[in-house]
Amino acid sequence: MLSTKIDAENAENAAEIEMQFAVKAVEQAQIYWSLLEMRKGSELKLTKYDDEIFEDLINTFPEFKDPKTASFVNEDEMKSAKGKAAWRPFLMRYEKKVDDYNFGTLLRIKNTDEYEQETTIFVPRMQFLAYEIARNRYGLNDWIKKD
């Protein structure tokens, strides 16, 4: 039995666990990209809560009323102490609604990029959903669909 508590926020993950998360994140990215190739993003529904998530996003972060905000992720800003404090309440509102709401997911930095190591960042699933739902609503992912 452990005599000290483990701080999950600061604990170092075993390499195997990190690899499993990375594999899942890549699989999810490949599936999402395939969906975008088959159907315009503006026609996709990612969850049954898309309308609520989008409305909550623009109410919580009014800058998302401008499609340009959804087109680019400022990783430094998002992952700063101020950014984390702003996003945390948004994420937590979906803890009991969206499965794996905090699971690590790959998000494209720019909506004009494909999924590549240099063009993606690792974020909680709810941040991915917030950005991608907004991108889809604004038609920013429609270019991906193959004819």
Swiss-Prot record:
What do the Gene Ontology cellular component annotations say? cytosol; nucleus
Q: Quick check: keyword Cytoplasm in the entry? A: yes
Pfam families documented for this protein: PBDC1 (PF04669)
Keyword terms of this UniProt record: Cytoplasm, Nucleus
Q: Where in the cell is it found?
A: Cytoplasm; Nucleus
Q: Which InterPro entries match?
A: PBDC1-like_dom_sf (IPR023139), PBDC1_metazoa/fungi (IPR008476), Polysacc_synth_dom (IPR021148)
What does the sequence similarity comment in the record state about its family?
A: Belongs to the PBDC1 family.
Query: Under what name is this protein listed?
Result: Protein PBDC1 homolog
Organism the protein comes from: Schizosaccharomyces pombe (strain 972 / ATCC 24843)
Lineage per the UniProt record: Eukaryota, Fungi, Dikarya, Ascomycota, Taphrinomycotina
